[in-house]
């Protein structure tokens, strides 16, 4: 599954990035506790103690909210940068099959992401015991949830890297996939509201039922987990990014194993994706710019002009992104 020779090669190739990722992920959680404690001590120095509370609340934005970033960087270094630099062909020429190569890259990154954050969780837990704050909110839920979400982000970018031929394409594809459910649902609904002059929530029994459905659908959008609003919901909500992680892993594994490497430098390794994706980009451009044009002046003329601009912009962006090969 994971070959030791490949593991050593990945370690030597990406040693600095791996060590920096480990350092950040290990320290992020305990540093959040230390920062809260120092803020409390600063309050005691400036004000009466009765106005100072030592409360650790993970629902307030803190450093671990960006723990997904190292996972993205690792995935780009493991696949996108290898393709952009032209070293992927050398790796594929080694006496290992593609399954071993992908599994080694994927599980090395996964191991770094999960184990580093578990160590950080343990250190933060020890600091809480030492500092003994008055209240601690969402510590376990947030710490474990961030591990799941950062692993999902890593899996998503790895899947994008297995489909694409350079680092830029990998990042753009990953970002597009992260917002794709929103684009598929929200843009058509918004345009229907403009065309028919009605609000979609009016067909629901109550505004509450509409907003409840919208909230539930947003849980299917990977990028929605970047902010920590999921903390106030059920802990079982984290099953969704966990399932997404496995789905992205399967997509990445199958794509890396089956797709040709001869198209390194191109946007997609599988050229049959070029045209459908270009059409999709143009459609999203038309719908998105159309809405922007309409809401700028609340006029149909603005809506039509926006759609025209969106079609042109979508065509050129997709053409120069997808059909122009990046030099490797």
UniProtKB/Swiss-Prot annotation:
The keyword rRNA-binding does not apply. Induction: Negatively regulated by YtrA. One of its GO terms (molecular function) is ABC-type transporter activity. It is a multi-pass membrane protein. Keywords: Cell membrane, Membrane, Transmembrane, Transmembrane helix, Transport. Its main location: membrane. The keyword Cell division does not apply. It comes from the Bacteria. One of its GO terms (cellular component) is plasma membrane. Coiled coil: none annotated. Pfam families: ABC2_membrane_2. The chain crosses the membrane at residues 16-36, 60-80, 110-130, 144-164, 167-187, 236-256, 277-297, 300-320. It is found in: Cell membrane. The complex is composed of 2 ATP-binding proteins (YtrB and YtrE), 2 transmembrane proteins (YtrC and YtrD) and a solute-binding protein (YtrF). Part of the ABC transporter complex YtrBCDEF that plays a role in acetoin utilization during stationary phase and sporulation. Belongs to the ABC-5 integral membrane protein family. This is Probable ABC transporter permease YtrC. It comes from Bacillus subtilis (strain 168).
């Amino acid at each position: 599954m994971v070959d030791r020779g490949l593991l050593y090669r990945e370690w030597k190739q990406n040693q600095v990035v791996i060590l920096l990722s480990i350092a950040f992920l290990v320290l992020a959680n305990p540093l959040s506790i230390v920062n809260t404690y120092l803020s409390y001590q600063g309050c005691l120095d400036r004000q009466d103690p009765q106005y100072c509370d030592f409360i650790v609340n993970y629902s307030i934005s803190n450093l671990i909210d960006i723990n997904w970033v190292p996972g993205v960087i690792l995935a780009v270094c493991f696949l996108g940068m290898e393709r952009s630099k032209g070293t992927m062909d050398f790796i594929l020429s080694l006496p290992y099959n593609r399954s071993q190569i992908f599994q080694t890259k994927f599980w090395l990154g996964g191991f770094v992401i999960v184990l580093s954050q578990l160590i950080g969780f343990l250190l933060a837990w020890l600091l809480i015991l030492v500092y003994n704050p008055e209240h601690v909110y969402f510590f376990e839920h947030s710490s474990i949830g961030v591990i799941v979400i950062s692993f999902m982000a890593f899996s998503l970018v790895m899947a994008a890297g297995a489909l694409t031929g350079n680092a830029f394409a990998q990042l753009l594809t990953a970002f597009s996939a992260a917002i794709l459910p929103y684009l598929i649902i929200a843009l058509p609904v918004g345009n229907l509201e403009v065309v028919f002059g009605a609000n979609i929530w009016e067909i629901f029994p109550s505004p509450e039922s509409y907003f409840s459905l919208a909230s539930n659908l947003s849980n299917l959008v990977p990028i929605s987990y970047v902010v920590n609003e999921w903390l106030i919901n059920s802990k079982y909500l984290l099953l969704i990014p966990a399932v997404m992680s496995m789905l992205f892993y399967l997509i990445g594994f199958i794509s890396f194993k089956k797709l040709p490497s001869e198209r390194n430098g191109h946007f997609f390794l599988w050229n049959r994706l070029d045209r459908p994706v270009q059409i999709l980009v143009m459609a999203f451009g038309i719908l998105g710019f159309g809405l922007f044009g309409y809401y700028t002046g609340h006029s149909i003329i603005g809506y039509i002009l926006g759609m025209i601009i969106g079609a042109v912009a979508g065509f050129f962006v997709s053409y120069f992104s997808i059909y122009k090969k990046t030099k490797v």
